[in-house]
Amino acid sequence: MRKFILIFLLFKPFISNSQEDKVALDLLNSMSENYKKMKGFTSSFTYTMENLTEDIKDSFSGKISVKDDKYILFIEGQKIINDSKTVWTYLEDLNEVTISDFDPSEQDISINNVFEIYKDGYRHKFIESTEGFSIVEIYPEDENKSYFKILFKILDNNLLSSFTVYDKSNSIYIYSIDDFLEEELVSELFTFDLEKYPDIEVIDFR
């Protein structure tokens, strides 16, 4: 009898973790499907970086428009356009644009791709649900990643309220969605027309 109880106690946490993983995956899938069905969206956000070791905290605002694999990002004086093949980074103060080929493997975690990132190479864990939102964490299976955890705060309407990246240097990167607008965006919006910028300096790495 004691042996049976011991086996049961060992097996019980496994069941609990499995159920938590399923809840987490269901929440992430519902969020992802919600964004995938949109014809486009524009979001304002606040980006905060904290380093607990160095006692550093920095914060600034940004704006992003997304359609499928394309996006336009405005942040810290930069306008970054990605049409899923080419990336233009425009610095208005310098009237300078840098052009490069888009490499998905080099893409940072951001509001344009975080809805899909959990699908491959991550473990999932449900943390809790409170009034209005749920919290889910994912952990990369690749130990060479610079971060060890991403925390999602998902609203009950399957929109993302915020996500937080925890890296191995004891830094925390928080992306908080300030406002969100679902809207239809034309593909022509996601390109950089050099003719509209007289005397611009072009740095082409392609």
Where are these regions (language model features)?
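Sec-dependent N-terminal signal peptides
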Residues: F4-K12
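Solvent-exposed coil/turn segments that connect beta secondary-structure elements
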Residues: T48-E50, K67-D69, E76-Q78, K85, ...
